[in-house]
């Protein structure tokens, strides 16, 4: 447990990594919403933001994910996937990624190609016919993504690394249901819709 007082604000990093804040600038609760207030504030007046954060020695908080997005491995490790997902999405080939691994020995990921120009640009520059479906099986594409995953893995702890990935042959959009209208990932939808693809990655490892 760690916290820092800064001006009229205290920020605290709980044992589970959740960012909590307290101070004169923080509301005392939700107007005429007792249950919501109880859910958001503890008995000591700390607002539980639901954000996962790392707090440095100077008291600056870096948001690394959302508590509800935590993956808990079979070894009991709590993993916030967003940091590594964001690293991997920097490659122009990649449009979306969803890390998985709840109750599993290691982390895997489902990846979809970028349909907004990035994958097409890469294909043109690398002598590959641009087609999302055929590119998902192209060895040159898979090798490029594997290299990028390896590079991204090197920037996080071993327990946070992606050991396997599956490149899907479709795009994720708000209309197809995997993304919200604001283009946020619907993890529960992905987990349900691609259950077979997810399980296949772990079957291969047995």
Question: What are the residue ranges of the model-derived segments?
Answer:
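C-terminal boundary motif of the adenylate-forming
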Residues: 52, 57, 90-116
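Conserved loop-to-beta-strand segment in the C-terminal subdomain of adenylate-forming
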Residues: 102-126, 154-169
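Conserved ATP-binding/catalytic segment of the ANL
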Residues: 11-13, 17-73, 90
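Adenylate-forming
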Residues: 26, 60-89, 119-139, 158-162, ...
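Active-site loops of AMP-binding adenylate-forming
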Residues: 5-8, 33-36, 115
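Single conserved hydrophobic/aromatic residue that forms the stacking wall/gate
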Residues: 1-13
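Conserved C-terminal "lid"/linker of ANL adenylate-forming enzymes
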Residues: 96, 148-206
């Amino acid at each position: 447990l760690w916290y820092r007082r800064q001006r009229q604000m205290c920020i605290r990093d709980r044992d589970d990594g959740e960012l909590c804040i307290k101070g004169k600038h923080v509301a005392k609760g939700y107007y005429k919403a007792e249950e919501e207030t109880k859910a958001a504030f503890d008995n000591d007046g700390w607002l539980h933001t639901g954000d996962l954060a790392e707090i440095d020695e100077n008291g600056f908080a870096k948001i690394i994910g959302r508590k509800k997005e935590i993956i808990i491995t079979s070894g009991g490790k709590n993993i916030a996937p967003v940091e590594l997902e964001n690293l991997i999405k920097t490659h122009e080939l990649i449009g979306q990624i969803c890390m998985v691994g709840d109750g599993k020995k290691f982390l895997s990921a489902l990846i979809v190609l970028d349909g907004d120009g990035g994958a097409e640009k890469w294909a043109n520059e690398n002598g590959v016919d641009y087609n999302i479906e055929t590119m998902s099986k192209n060895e040159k594409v898979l090798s490029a993504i594997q290299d990028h995953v390896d590079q991204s893995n090197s920037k996080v702890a071993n327990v946070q690394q992606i050991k396997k990935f599956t490149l899907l042959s479709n795009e994720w959009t708000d209309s197809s249901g995997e993304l919200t209208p604001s283009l946020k990932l619907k993890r529960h939808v992905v987990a349900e819709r691609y259950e077979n693809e997810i399980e296949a990655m772990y079957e291969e490892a047995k």
